[in-house]
Amino acid sequence: MAELTIDPATIRKALDDFVEAYTPSETPTQEVGHVATAGDGIAHVTGLPGCMANELLTFEDGTLGLAFNLDAREIGVVILGDFVGIEEGQEVRRTGEVLSVPVGDGFLGRVVDPLGRPIDGMGEIKSEGRRILEAQAPDVMHRHPVDQPMSTGLKAIDAMTPIGRGQRQLIIGDRQTGKTAIAIDTIINQKKNWESGDPKKQVRCIYVAIGQKGSTIASVKQSLEEAGAMEYTTIVASPASDSAGFKYIAPYTGSAIGQHWMYNGKDVLIVFDDLSKQAEAYRSISLLLRRPPGREAYPGDVFYLHSRLLERCARVSDDLGGGSMTGLPIVETKANDVSAYIPTNVISITDGQIFLQSDLFNAGQRPAVDVGISVSRVGGAAQTKALKKVSGTLKISLARYRSLESFAMFASDLDAASKAQLNRGARLTELLKQPQFSPYSMEQEVVSVWAGTHGKFDDLAIADVLPFEHGLLEYVDRNTDILTTIRDTGDFTKETEEALDKAVDAFRETYVTKAGKPLVDKKTAPKSVTPVDQEQIKAGKAQEKK
């Protein structure tokens, strides 16, 4: 029998023929895992060894999930959306993508969910691209100093705690103290800039509603529509009925939409209403995923939760487009306690805070800004020259009034100077009252604050302060060019001050008080006296009667 031999050349030729004839299968391969447990907006998934942190996963019913915990045995997934249809044993697939949202001018005037999907029934949104949610904040070398004003239209804020474009200014206070009202008024105040058509003045606004009632979000949208502000505003809505995952990512969605405009040279204003509810949602997610709790049961990285969000608000250098994103985060306190965990975290991250006092709000002082605690660390450099000149003594005067007011409650007799301070402080406090949806222009704020700090309201009854102010602004606008001069120059010169002084004196001669009496008796020549002199005269008359 002949011996069987194999020729190496034959083997090589057979292998080459096989390789040349081989065609790989066109069937795609994909990692598939299975739901081990699901509930409360959380799912534990097994069988996805290649999954990345923050990767998007898809469940059988199309619901998206965010890979949050990567353990050796399983993955902790935050379900983004309704989790009712997710059950044990269902398949889970990787997408190979991180969470991103569509961006572009098509979002102006629209209401979207935290995934960027329209929920206002107005059809699809035409996007200009996509932007990842976990984007890096601009570094120090690519930031520009804050030196342009972001006017709120509120006298109490623009005069004492000014905000600049690119600043992070915290609005903090108890529930029902007017925090959202300040943010909405600031958005409405940008209407004139938008209608000017000047890209350098226009501000695109984003309102992020986190854990709010659906009726509240609808009310905000209606208010913006009635004021004509919705055309330059985007609302990112995550109402109280949404899952904790949606409340967690909603602020990042709004920030991603705003960053697209910022890096294209646009100015953006974003309101986070409010970050307390985002922190609570993040706490519930972390506890359900068995992450170690810390102070007040919040996870250890809750500071990073807010810092990486708010650090994206900046005014960037020309190399990155020269745009800006101004952040107005809102935080709710309990019993005016600003030393709690989340409030102190956000205060340390932001560039200042506007503290709203519930006692002031209940006393009718609205906006209820507490002058003593409120501060703007960088906004002073952005304040217009005119407003800076007239408001220099306002904050000090009000602070002295507050301290003297509490002392006067227990003092039976005060000297004339103290009474004069109380008299002016009460009228300045009344002057700073402002109803909602009635923002002032910068030049109107200058005239109003100047008149208040220069004693033009001192001899008025408290009830006459606001009517006198409204009449004065109308008189100055109708009979002089003072408002136009301040608006065009942005300055308050000595000549403008002299002209305003004459205009105020002329208006005083025509003003009739609420009691029906003229403010100035034309039959008697007015005597020039100081408020202290007036108090001394009154005290002398009282002694004569005795």
Curated annotation (Swiss-Prot):
Residues 520-546 are annotated as: Disordered. It is found in: Cell membrane. Residues 535-546 have a biased composition (Basic and acidic residues). InterPro entries: ATP_synth_asu-like_sf, ATP_synth_asu_C, ATP_synth_asu_C_sf, ATP_synth_F1_a_nt-bd_dom, ATP_synth_F1_asu, ATPase_a/bsu_AS, ATPase_F1/V1/A1_a/bsu_N, ATPase_F1/V1/A1_a/bsu_N_sf. It is an enzyme of class 7 (translocase). It catalyses: ATP + H2O + 4 H(+)(in) = ADP + phosphate + 5 H(+)(out). Disulfide bonds: none annotated. The keyword Cell cycle does not apply. It holds the Pfam family ATP-synt_ab. Transmembrane segments: none annotated. The keyword Protease does not apply. Keywords: ATP synthesis, ATP-binding, Cell membrane, CF(1), Hydrogen ion transport, Ion transport, Membrane, Nucleotide-binding, Translocase, Transport. It is a peripheral membrane protein. GO terms for molecular function: ADP binding; ATP binding; proton-transporting ATP synthase activity, rotational mechanism. GO terms for cellular component: plasma membrane; proton-transporting ATP synthase complex. The record marks S374 as: Required for activity. PROSITE patterns: ATPASE_ALPHA_BETA. HAMAP family: ATP_synth_alpha_bact. F-type ATPases have 2 components, CF(1) - the catalytic core - and CF(0) - the membrane proton channel. CF(1) has five subunits: alpha(3), beta(3), gamma(1), delta(1), epsilon(1). CF(0) has three main subunits: a(1), b(2) and c(9-12). The alpha and beta chains form an alternating ring which encloses part of the gamma chain. CF(1) is attached to CF(0) by a central stalk formed by the gamma and epsilon chains, while a peripheral stalk is formed by the delta and b chains. PANTHER family: ATP SYNTHASE SUBUNIT ALPHA, MITOCHONDRIAL. Belongs to the ATPase alpha/beta chains family. This is ATP synthase subunit alpha. It comes from Bifidobacterium animalis subsp. lactis (strain AD011). The gene is atpA.
